[in-house]
């Protein structure tokens, strides 16, 4: 097994550590393909956690792209551990960490999953090719049955229920903000 060493320098301080993770932790293992400007999985999860959203409330991403916000929300709702679909460098260190311990941790995390829940998580985008990518990513994450993805323009954003959350990573260009602002009224908020 290899033991990658990481050295960090900041001014006159040196920190030396062993990399137990391998690939960066923001790579959850479900997103093989992404859209043009994807938000990292960890940032999406953190932004969702900053809201009072919970699985009993509606969550809509009107510019869902490759589906990161809806997928992270569905994983939270189903209590799926963020690292379930990836491997870690330390898994190969069986001389330090017994293989059985990894199996026990994975089994415990699997036992905590609640995928038979009902949630209202929706992802929309005008580009049908990214909706296809979002569906594939949700399937890889094991939450495709919890999310409704649809080709839809943000100007058609509406929902029969009164309260919920809109969380999104809007496109950086090619959309007129004034049109989006006119779509959402004070009554909608």
Predicted regions mapped to residue ranges:
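Amphipathic alpha-helical repeat scaffolds
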Residues: 137, 168-175
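Non-cysteine beta-strand/loop elements that form the S-adenosyl-L-methionine
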Residues: 17, 167-168
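Non-catalytic substrate-recognition/targeting regions of SAM-dependent transferases
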Residues: 1-30
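Class I SAM-dependent methyltransferase Rossmann-like catalytic core
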Residues: 29-39
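A short acidic, Gly/Pro-enriched loop at the edge of an enzyme's catalytic core
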Residues: 155-167
């Amino acid at each position: 097994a290899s033991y990658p060493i990481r050295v960090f320098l900041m001014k006159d301080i040196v920190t030396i550590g062993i990399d137990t993770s391998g690939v960066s932790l923001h790579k959850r293992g479900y997103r093989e393909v992404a859209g043009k400007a994807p938000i990292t999985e960890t940032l999406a999860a953190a932004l969702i956690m900053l809201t009072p959203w919970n699985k009993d409330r509606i969550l809509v991403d009107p510019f869902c792209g490759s589906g990161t916000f809806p997928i992270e929300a569905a994983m939270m709702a189903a209590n799926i551990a963020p690292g379930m679909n990836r491997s870690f460098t330390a898994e190969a260190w069986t001389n330090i960490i017994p293989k059985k311990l990894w199996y026990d941790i994975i089994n415990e995390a699997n036992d905590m999953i609640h995928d038979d829940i009902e949630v209202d998580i929706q992802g929309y985008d005008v580009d049908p090719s990214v909706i296809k990518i979002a569906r594939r990513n949700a399937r890889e994450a094991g939450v495709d049955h919890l999310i409704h993805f649809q080709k839809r323009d943000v100007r058609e954003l509406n929902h029969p229920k009164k309260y919920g959350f809109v969380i999104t990573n809007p496109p950086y260009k090619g959309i007129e903000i004034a049109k989006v602002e006119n779509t959402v009224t004070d009554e909608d908020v």
